[in-house]
Swiss-Prot record:
Protein name: Pentatricopeptide repeat-containing protein At3g09040, mitochondrial
GO biological process, one term: RNA modification
Organism of this sequence: Arabidopsis thaliana
Residue ranges, annotated region (Type E motif): 904-979
Pfam families found in the cross-reference section: E_motif (PF20431), PPR (PF01535), PPR_2 (PF13041)
Subcellular location per the Swiss-Prot or TrEMBL entry: Mitochondrion
């Protein structure tokens, strides 16, 4: 009754978390609480457990419980009952209770129950650890690693237990690359020197055959514990360096560390492998109470070393010590008995296996079969084989080897045929399920293996298996293989055609998808809604209005035009092709208004007419159709202009009023995009701060991109740093965004750090990311880094890559390199574009290659048919003017018949200033001021011309005009990285802490310039350099 009182809802004493947690250890406690009469496997254990619990002797209770068979099965039954009871009583399953329930199901290996409970939780690191531990224990390493990545994506900070679980998985799978990434994360979190995490790292590197790395990690651990030492010398053992392992063990003992049980067992095993059986026995004798693992090592080790009699002796000594044998113990001693062919001892061990309930174990059964076979007792072996209901390939092989050993070849073939025919009952439904699993996990290798078995079993012509194979290969990225399977299929149904057409649409190969769709109809296969939807999606991708209309006609013919799914796809196709009128017609023809079809039409209106979209939204509310998150996200995205910010804010209010959360990634990014695109940066930042953590990578990237697009580059970089501090791993879109920010800020140090992170995260560099890196390095002045990224690109078929490198060389003064890259580009048959020629002409201008510049300009127009833009002409004017061809530059401007543009006169004005052509310069400056009266550079250059002529009155008058017009000189800025610190300089600003040293250095430079006649001494003395 006491326990029943604890379960009443009114009782304040009920600690649901502690209770559920204990179920993993004491299911009998739960059985007594609920009063269920659940028969125990061993009534004595049950009674002992009840007595210990009644006396609150929990330690003894646990010891008794650990000896009870089938305790996990009992724990699961009781756990489900307690979980059900907590739901009935209305107990909140969040927090510690929820974690405890997940932990219970995880420890009982109930994957589906654990995942369902986990999905309902507000997850913390404890829940994640339970799931990771479960996936690890049931042998699903892929799940472990993917869940670990999801943990980071959900911005949950892992703890030492998390790292330990994932590192152990990496160790088992020898996935050293993923392990290194985890190592980097641990370094960032400052956990690599922790003995717990350090030990896991040592173990991972050791098991991945990176013993040198394991040793380096070990030496970094502040205070290595016994586990760390054990992992290290275990690593040396695995690496085939047993002598070094023994040295580590001896050093461990010399430094005062008491080896734990695992250490003893590992070193004993090492001694045995080295053939030092005497040392192994001496060390084994030092163990106060060796457990079954230690005994197994001695039995197995001596048996493998040819000391079968000693191994058998250790087995019987173990029995005298009251240590219970395991299947490994029995397997090892049976192997030794088989070698000595001592049937009497074999019978004793067989009796022991029956007594322990292990005779039905497949491993023990295989050992028994092997032992009897070697004792030439195949009848006894056959009895063991037949007695076992569940057989695996090991068991079958043991019998085959037994008959072979005894020369019964006909029995071998008979058993082999039985094994193939009835041993494994795998049919087409089984293979379909297996292939579906491969498709979902994108496991092409496993799928290919199943395909081989299917071929051998002649199931490849089965329609269901064929469809599953096409789907598996397509989803695993092997579309050509999927097509081959498709072409070889004798029978095809709608599922077959839908699968292959949808695969090509997904691969963005719309032309092939259209061809297959036509072929399908020619074969007389009636299209269904799924097939039409896939084909219409292809039409949408290429804006194929003609093909879309054909599909529309076919849908009418098939009677599917009024189908909701097909109708929505038609609306989407017409909208994205810009035919909103036809989209509205399709919408009106549908039998009822649904949120799906309305969303499609609202999306169409949003792209073409925001006002119509708002009207349709209001009509939607009037008709009683409740908008969804997609509805709001679609219409909010359309409010991307400053004038529509008010409307967007009103929709934001509607979202909140209707109970929709901005936490959702799709809706959240839509709102943030709306605010930032309409320059509502304050509102965007406020919304972002309100979103709960962990925030997704999409939201972080959106904030960076929005700030960058609005010119807030430093703020964008701050968001990136905050994101990294929160433990969120960037993706390719994030890298591209933040690298562009580094380009604008000329932040080479940050750019290099991001490049390094891309490398360490093992991201494949696509063309976009590579081009952005090339541009970043170039704009930061590091052409070596830019060239290296370019050289490492797998494919350089995109003109953007070449343009980035050419312009980088040109702007950094490496004209010869720019021209060489231009020649290489043409030799690689890459067609140059306008940007290419602009970069090459810039290079010619900086290097004074007037003749080459003229030829390239003519090549652009004559050979490649590219019309000269103002930028190209301005570049040519700069080239001619910079090197003294002022008259030709002036004539060149007049010959182009272009609309007057400030860039042309600005280039000519700069050239006149350099070569002292004051008359032409004055004319150019006046034309420039006429075109751009607010451009301060024109006034400054003209003022310098007046100053050089000594016309101070004109210069002062010009400055007065600047003041009257409100024209202010825009200060120039520069960023310089020195010793990992970015220094920002602005023209006219003397607030830098080292300004004194800077001015002294500038004076020295001025003196050198005067001595070399680089500048006119009179100009320097008059201080007119300050105006430039």
């Amino acid at each position: 009754m006491y326990f029943r009182v604890l379960l009443t809802p009114s009782s304040a004493m009920f600690d649901s978390f502690s209770f559920v947690r204990r179920l993993s250890y004491s299911p009998d406690l739960g059985r007594r609480i609920y009063g269920h009469v659940l028969p125990s496997h061993d009534q004595i254990h049950q009674r002992l457990l009840e007595i210990c619990l009644g006396q609150c002797k929990l330690f003894k209770s646990r010891k008794v419980f650990d000896e009870m068979p089938q305790r996990l099965a009992l724990a699961l039954r009781i756990g489900k009952a307690v979980h059900s009871k907590s739901l009935i009583l209305g107990i909140d399953s969040e927090g510690r209770l929820g974690n405890a329930i997940v932990d219970l199901y995880a420890k009982c290996a109930q994957v589906s129950y654990a995942e369902k409970q986990f999905d309902f939780l507000e997850k913390d690191v404890t829940a994640w650890n339970s799931m990771l531990s479960m996936y690890s224990s049931i042998g699903k390493p892929g799940k472990v690693l993917r869940s670990f990545v999801s943990l980071f994506e959900n911005q949950i900070f892992p703890n030492k237990f998390t790292f330990s679980i994932v590192l152990s998985t990496c160790a088992r799978e020898t996935n050293v690359e993923f392990g290194r990434q985890i190592h980097c994360s641990m370094i960032k979190m400052g956990l690599e020197r922790n003995s717990y995490c350090g030990g896991a790292l040592v173990d991972m590197y050791a098991k991945c055959d990176r013993i040198s790395d394991a040793r380096r990690v070990f030496e970094w651990i502040v205070d290595p514990n016994t586990v760390c030492w054990t992992c290290l010398f275990s690593g040396y053992v695995k690496a085939g360096l047993p002598e070094e392992a023994v040295l580590v063990f001896e050093r461990m003992r010399d430094e005062g560390h008491r080896p734990d049980h695992l250490a003893f067992v590992t070193v004993i095993n090492t001694y045995i492998r080295l053939g030092k059986l005497k040392d192994a026995r001496l060390l084994f004798g030092e163990m106060s109470s060796p457990d079954v693992v230690a005994w197994n090592v001695m039995i197995s080790g001596h048996g493998k070393r040819g000391c079968e009699t000693v191994a058998i002796e250790y087995f019987f000594n173990m029995r005298k010590s009251s240590v219970k044998s395991t299947r490994s113990t029995l397997g090892s001693v049976l192997s030794a008995i088989g070698i000595v062919a001592n049937l009497d001892l074999g019978l004793v061990v067989h009796a022991e296996a029956i007594k322990l309930g292990l005779a039905s174990n497949i491993y023990v059964g295989s050992s028994l079969v092997s032992m009897y076979s070697k004792c030439e007792k195949m009848e006894a072996a056959a009895k063991v084989f037949e007695a076992l209901e569940e057989k695996n390939d090991v068991f079958w092989n043991a019998m085959i080897r037994g008959y072979a050993h005894n020369g019964e070849s006909h029995k071998v073939m008979e058993l082999f045929m039985d094994m193939k025919s009835s041993g494994y009952n795998i049919d087409d439904f089984t293979f379909t399920s297996l292939l579906s699993t491969c498709a979902a996990s994108h496991d092409l290798e496993m799928g290919s293996q199943f395909h081989s078995i299917i071929i051998k079993k002649k199931l490849a012509k089965n329609l269901f298996v064929g469809n599953a194979l096409v789907d598996m290969y397509a989803k695993c990225g092997a579309l050509e293989d999927a097509r081959q399977i498709f072409e070889r299929m004798c029978d095809r149904d709608n599922v077959t055609w839908n699968t292959i057409i949808g695969s090509y649409v997904q691969d963005e190969n719309e032309s092939e998808a259209f061809d297959l769709f036509k072929r399908m109809n020619l074969c007389g296969i009636v299209s269904d809604g799924a097939c039409l939807a896939s084909t219409l999606k292809a039409c949408t991708h290429v804006h194929g209005l003609y093909q879309g209309k054909q599909v529309h006609c076919l849908s009418v013919k098939c009677g599917l035009d009024r189908d909701l799914h097909t109708g929505s796809s038609l609306i989407d196709m017409y909208s994205k092709c810009g035919i909103i009128k036809d989209a509205r017609k399709v919408f009106s023809s549908l039998p009822e208004w649904s949120v799906v079809s309305m969303n499609a039409l609202i999306a169409g209106y949003s792209q073409n007419n925001l006002e119509e979209a708002v009207v349709l939204f209001q009509e939607m509310l009037t008709r009683g159709v409740n908008p969804s998150e997609i509805t709001f996200a679609t219409i909010v995205e359309a409010c991307h202009k400053p004038e529509s910010l008010t409307l967007g804010t009103q929709f934001h209010g509607q979202i909140t009023k209707r109970g929709f959360s901005s936490e959702g990634e799709y809706l959240g990014i839509s709102l943030l995009g709306m605010y930032m695109n309409s320059r509502g940066m304050t509102e965007a930042c406020a919304l972002f701060s309100e979103l709960s953590s962990p925030k997704s990578i999409v939201l972080w990237t959106g904030m960076m991109s929005g700030h960058s697009q609005n010119g807030f580059y430093e703020e964008a970089l701050k968001f990136y740093k905050e994101m990294r501090h929160d433990g969120v791993l960037p993706d390719q879109a994030t890298f591209v965004t933040v690298l562009r920010v580094c380009s604008v800020l000329s932040s080479l140090r940050e750019g290099r750090a991001i490049h390094s992170l891309i490398f360490h995260l093992a991201h494949d560099l696509d063309e976009l990311t590579s081009n952005t890196l090339i541009d970043m390095y170039a704009k930061c002045g590091d052409m070596k880094g830019s060239s290296q990224v370019f050289d490492e690109m797998r494919r350089r078929s995109n003109v953007v890559s070449w343009n980035s490198l050419i312009n980088g060389y040109a702007k950094n003064g490496y004209a010869e390199d720019a021209l060489k890259i231009f020649d290489s580009m043409r030799q690689s048959h890459i067609m140059p574009d306008e940007i290419t020629f602009l970069g090459v002409l810039t290079a010619c201008s900086h290097a004074g290659k007037v003749s080459d510049g003229r030829k390239i300009f003519e090549m652009m127009i004559g050979q490649y048919g590219i019309e000269a833009r103002v930028d190209h002409v301005a570049c040519m004017v700069d080239l001619l003017g910079r090197w003294g061809y002022l008259q030709e530059a002036d004539d060149f401007i007049e010959a182009q018949n272009l609309k007057p543009d400030a860039r042309l006169w600005s280039s000519l004005l700069g050239a006149c200033r350099i070569h002292g052509d004051d008359i032409r310069g004055e004319i150019s400056a006046e034309k420039l001021i006429e075109l751009e009266p607010q451009n301060s550079s024109a006034y400054v250059l003209l003022s310098n011309i007046y100053a050089s002529q000594g016309c101070w009155e004109k210069a002062n008058a010009l400055r007065k005009v600047m003041r009257d017009r409100g024209v202010k000189k825009v200060p120039g800025y520069s960023w310089i990285d020195v010793e990992q610190r970015t220094h920002i300089f602005a023209a006219g600003d003397k607030s830098h802490s080292e300004i004194g040293k800077i001015e002294m250095f500038l004076e020295d430079l001025y003196d050198l310039m005067k001595d070399d006649a680089v500048v006119n001494p009179d100009i320097v003395e008059q201080g007119s350099l300050d105006c430039v």
